[in-house]
Swiss-Prot record:
Belongs to the TRAFAC class translation factor GTPase superfamily. Classic translation factor GTPase family. IF-2 subfamily. This is Probable translation initiation factor IF-2. Keywords: GTP-binding, Initiation factor, Nucleotide-binding, Protein biosynthesis. PANTHER family: EUKARYOTIC TRANSLATION INITIATION FACTOR 5B, TRANSLATION INITIATION FACTOR IF-2-RELATED. It comes from Methanothermobacter thermautotrophicus (strain ATCC 29096 / DSM 1053 / JCM 10044 / NBRC 100330 / Delta H). One of its GO terms (molecular function) is translation initiation factor activity. The lineage of its organism: Archaea, Methanobacteriati, Methanobacteriota, Methanomada group, Methanobacteria. GTP binds at residues 12-19, 76-80, 130-133. Residues 76-79 are annotated as: G3. The gene is infB.
Length: 594
């Protein structure tokens, strides 16, 4: 049983310093000239323990971190796209993460996105509060630990930094994470460590690496144990063409051993495929790369954790994010891969939205967020939006308008689908920031629900009262026409009217004001009203107050579901109308209809 290096991913908003941080960590490792140096992998950099000790100095001892790990394995492709692509069953491939935030700008949209993804995958993380060298008045001490450089700053600069750190603490608290500046953390199990750093000057990097080692020691003892002789398990990071090599696969191996000539199984958009490895390639060390034009060198085998380039036939359609397995039992491996894919793709509903994404990991992330929002999903798949997707969304639209949507993350729309969309009522949400897609979808659904509610509200007969103005009778009957004043609420064409004894006297047939026909009239308005079935001097009289005769089922809907949309005056009138109705039927409005 061997302990592998924990896999570390760097996430954060664009321009907040993800790539600069990775470059600096690599540069520090090379410059430290410690025994062993760094090991360059495809898509990753491994920094061995003796190099970390050289960078961190006494911090490992100060924080009681034992030297039980071989080092740290950094994924070179920063950002949450790589984080979600690099997945394995049950969660993210990364064991730990650095959430990098510009201390001067604070949280930005992609910071929020990254935090949501870390929460979703339950990945332990630290916050690197970057660009402390940009704080006004900061005096740079290249490569020094944060505590040392902080102690050499003016008191005003120290206060500025602490204010900015506590702004991050507040923001993380809003998101449900308790956090503190790393040297003030009292419980590393329940608090997120914030490490102020400069990725450019290297200040704070020793503490950042120390905190990562501490997290690994605390959380990852068991999951870092691997059988180095067992068949390799990994994840596809990218499928790409290399000059002179043809199509190649970049993969991260997180368990076992991978050898040249092994048969490996992976997922394409259609099925599981198997192929035999022709070559395993790793980057040449920098000094060798200067002497040779070749970027890669061949190796016979790699042991986890490892980033490797694989040359093999028939891999053009392999999906990024697909599991990679060495084939020992073909049927068993096939079932294992299919089962893992089905977990994401097939858990769909009879009716719901269509979801398309570029990789398995991003599809999994989008589906999980939609599930948390209780949004049903009809189709969840990988690849560009096709005509078939539009047809599926059209079928879902028949069920409910809010299902007539395609959520497309990081994918294109093929021309035939674009044409089909033009001729349909399907709504397309397309982008590369998951949370923004979700926000846009939610906003669209809210608009539809508001529209539905508005139509529903219009269909519900609401409380209103009118007074028949004396000496303004234009016709006695068929229909009775006279001047009225609206006392409460809004009176509409078609509303039934009753008197204060609860007797129905007629229906509002039409209304006019200065010769203009009206469909409704509001409180304070005086209009000419035609009342069907009413007779002035017999069923209605000048000066009478008439009330809208609300049907009992409408009364319950208003009372139980729409009371928030009524004014206090209208609610009081509802009680008055109920009181009038109960003169004839004491139980009126008391029992909800079943």
């Amino acid at each position: 049983m061997k302990i592998r290096s924990p896999i570390v991913s760097v996430l954060g908003h664009v321009d907040h310093g993800k790539t600069t941080l990775l470059d600096h960590i690599r540069g520090s490792a090379v410059a430290s000239r410690e025994a062993g140096g760094i090991t360059q992998h495809i898509g990753a950099t491994e920094i061995p323990m003796d190099v970390i000790e050289g960078i961190c100095g006494d911090f490992l001892k100060k924080f009681s971190i034992r030297e039980t790990l071989p080092g740290l394995f950094f994924i070179d492709t920063p950002g949450h796209e790589a984080f979600t692509t690099l997945r394995k069953r049950g969660g993210a491939l990364a064991d730990l993460a650095i959430l990098i935030v510009d201390i001067n700008e604070g949280f930005k949209p992609q910071t929020q996105e990254a935090l949501n993804i870390l929460r979703m995958y339950r990945t332990p993380f630290v916050v690197a509060a970057n660009k402390i060298d940009r704080i006004h008045g900061w005096r740079v001490h290249e490569g020094r630990p944060f505590m040392e450089t902080f102690s050499k700053q003016d008191i005003q600069v120290q206060q500025k930094l602490d204010t900015k750190v506590y702004e991050l603490v507040g923001k993380l608290h809003e998101e449900g994470f308790e956090s503190e500046r790393f040297d003030r953390v009292t419980d590393f199990a329940s608090q997120v460590s914030i490490i102020p750093i400069s990725a450019i000057t290297g200040e704070g990097i020793p503490e950042l690496l120390t905190m990562l080692m501490g997290l690994a020691q605390q959380y990852l003892r068991e999951q870092l144990k691997i059988e180095e002789d067992s068949p390799a398990r990994g994840t596809i990071l990218e499928v790409k063409e290399e000059t002179g090599l043809g199509m190649t696969i970049d993969a991260v191996i997180y368990d076992g051993i991978l050898r040249k000539d092994d048969t490996i199984a992976m997922m394409t958009s259609k099925d599981v495929i198997s192929t035999r490895i022709r070559s395993l390639l790793k980057p040449r060390p920098l000094e060798e790369m200067r002497e040779s034009r070749k970027k890669f060198q061949k190796v016979d085998e790699v042991v986890a954790a490892a980033g490797i380039k694989i040359v093999a036939p028939g891999i053009d359609d392999v999906m990024a994010g697909s599991p990679l397995r060495v084939v020992t039992d073909p049927e068993k491996v096939r079932e294992e891969i299919l089962s893992e894919i089905e977990d994401i793709k097939i858990d769909t509903d009879e009716a719901g939205v269509v979801v398309k994404a570029d990789t398995l990991g991003s599809l999994e992330a989008v589906v999980k967020i939609l599930r948390d929002m209780y949004v049903p999903i009809k189709v969840a798949d990988i690849g560009d939006v096709s005509r078939r997707d539009v047809v599926n969304a059209g079928i879902a639209l028949q069920e409910d308008r809010v299902y007539g949507a395609i959520i497309a993350f990081n994918v294109k729309v093929i021309p035939s689908a674009a044409q089909e969309l033009k001729n349909s009522d399907i709504k397309l949400f397309q982008g590369n920031v998951i949370y923004r897609l979700m926000e846009e979808y939610e906003e669209w659904v809210r608009g539809i629900e508001e529209e539905k509610k508005k139509k529903w509200m219009e269909a519900i007969i609401k409380p209103a009262s009118i007074r028949l103005i004396p000496k303004l009778v234009f016709r006695q009957s068929k229909p009775a026409i006279g001047g009225v004043e609206v006392l409460t609420g809004v009176i509409r064409q078609g509303y039934p009217l009753m008197n204060d004894d609860g007797e129905t006297v007629g229906t509002v047939e039409s209304m006019q004001d200065k010769g203009e026909n009206l469909k409704s009239a509001s409180r304070g308005q005086k209009v000419a009203m035609a009342i069907k079935d009413a007779v002035y001097g017999k069923t209605i009289h000048e000066g009478d107050t008439l009330y809208v005769d609300i049907p009992e089922n409408h009364y319950h809907i208003l009372k139980e579901q729409l009371s928030g949309d009524l004014t206090d005056e209208e609610l009081d009138l509802m009680d008055k109308i109920a009181e009038i109705k109960r003169k004839k039927n004491p139980d009126w409005g008391m029992k909800a209809p079943f």
